[in-house]
């Protein structure tokens, strides 16, 4: 079964302590993740940071096209709270949406994501293959990823082991830039 997957950068201004966008970053990693799953799952990219979406606008986006999986990329520790807010918004729309946190913050400081009841999975390390395998598992096609994914359930965190570095970058597809809305 194909999943409806939304990949997103949260708006850093959702964190009460941050008053402005520090930078607009090209969604390279979201494009790469999208390319890894695009042939098997329906995927879109939401750049709430670049588009300066409010939580309410983000919520409407999810209501109009509800995902089965929301992948949240948090690119620096200072913005962890924005990622958690994105997961909260998604779970308010539909508690069955599977939320997945990834990015630098999930690798270097996963504690806020582990403590949030709105984050279901955490991808740690180079997550291209781990995220693809997690989506396939959630769609009923494959086993839980052997490496790189933390899962929360029954009051404890279950890890699937440390992900290996991707040694041959030429094996990765080109990012799915056609999914990025350049205004």
Question: What spans do the regions from the language model cover?
Answer:
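N-terminal [4Fe-4S]-dependent radical SAM core
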Residues: 11-14, 19, 146, 151-183
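Glycine- and acidic-residue-enriched helix-capping/strand-helix junction motifs
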Residues: 16-30
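Extreme N-terminal starter segment of soluble prokaryotic enzymes
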Residues: 2-5
């Amino acid at each position: 079964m194909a999943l409806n997957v939304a990949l997103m950068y949260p708006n850093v201004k959702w964190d009460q302590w941050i008053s402005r966008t520090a930078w607009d970053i090209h969604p390279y990693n979201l494009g790469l993740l999208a390319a890894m799953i695009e042939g098997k799952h329906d995927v879109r990219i939401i750049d709430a940071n670049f588009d300066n979406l409010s939580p309410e606008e983000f919520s409407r986006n999810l209501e109009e096209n509800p995902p089965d999986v929301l992948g949240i990329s948090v690119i620096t520790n200072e913005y962890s709270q924005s990622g958690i807010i994105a997961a909260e918004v998604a779970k308010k729309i539909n508690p069955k949406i599977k939320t997945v946190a990834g990015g630098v913050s999930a690798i270097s400081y996963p504690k806020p994501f582990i403590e949030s009841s709105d984050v279901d999975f955490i991808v740690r390390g180079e997550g291209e293959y781990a995220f693809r395998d997690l989506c396939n598992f959630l769609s009923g096609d494959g086993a839980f990823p052997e490496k790189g994914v933390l899962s929360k359930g029954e009051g404890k965190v279950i890890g699937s082991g440390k992900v290996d570095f991707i040694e041959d970058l030429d094996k990765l597809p080109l990012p799915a830039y056609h999914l990025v809305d350049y205004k």
